[in-house]
A protein has these predicted regions:
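Small cysteine-rich, disulfide-bonded extracellular modules of the LU/uPAR three-finger superfamily
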Residues: 1-84, 92-121
Length: 121
């Protein structure tokens, strides 16, 4: 399965409201992990198909002027012996602003696993 990323309609609406000066744009603070992917995510989604864990980001890097990378590392204990095939970036209000589905990633119980999620224009 090829990786597919979708910006949610809710995420788009928040950007538009911030640009219009109606509300402030809440920062992305967490990454969600799941194993229920069954195709490309829909822009109307605000939940993973089967969310397993939501975790604070480990870091944020500016890759270029129009690309930020969000990083989250799972410890050995987190989601041990679990398959992961859907991810999301979550803002501080708890909303999913971007969802990505991907091929199965098997998380063993003897290793950390780091996920990177690029947000680019």
């Amino acid at each position: 399965m090829a990786s597919t990323t979708t910006i949610t309609k809710l995420g788009k609406n928040k950007v538009l409201k911030a640009r219009a000066g109606i509300t402030a744009l809440p920062p992305i603070t967490q990454m969600a992990f799941g194993n229920g992917a069954n195709g490309a995510p829909l822009e109307d989604d605000n939940a993973l198909k089967n969310e397993l864990l939501r975790k604070d980001l480990s870091g944020i890097e500016q890759v270029t002027e129009t690309n930020f990378r969000y990083i989250c590392t799972l410890t050995k204990e987190e989601l041990a012996d679990t398959t992961i095939n859907e991810l999301a970036l979550c803002d501080e209000e708890g909303d999913l602003v971007m969802i990505r589905t991907c091929s199965d990633k098997n998380k063993d119980d003897d290793e950390e696993m780091t996920f990177e999620f690029d947000d680019k224009f």
